[in-house]
Amino acid sequence: MKNLEQYTRYPKGKSEKKLSGRLGLYWDESIQDWELIVSDSKRISEFLKVYQTELKDDDDKFTLMGLIVSSFDDGINKADAEMLELWEICKTILKKECFLHFSIIEYWSFLEEKDIENVFSITLYIREVWNDVRLNFEC
């Protein structure tokens, strides 16, 4: 494997604050794991639309994608056809922008865990993304 540190990113407070204002979400500078706290599976379509039409800054895109994936994790167990269609859009973005979203893909894939009873609800879906992009990160 290549040195993967170069692809490691973390959400930026500045982006969290900006996105909170844009999306009407709670934000406080003392919050850790903002994307987990404010996730909302009912708003995935809105989040994806903002991602696709309004964002140019990589920090903002990374931070919003973290919120989107966390929101999928909240709702994927009771997914209907609409949510699965939204997942296909998200999956396409993750694959296309895999270098930007490497940290999100790696975290939610939970690759070291083999027992599917001990993974996130979204893990099996994200592992499909990982399987499609991992060659980009191998020697």
Residue ranges and their predicted role:
Residues 2-6, 98-139:
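Eukaryotic acidic, Ser/Thr-rich intrinsically disordered low-complexity regions
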Residues 2-3, 7, 14-96, 104-113:
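Alpha-helical solenoid scaffolds in large eukaryotic transport, assembly, and signaling factors
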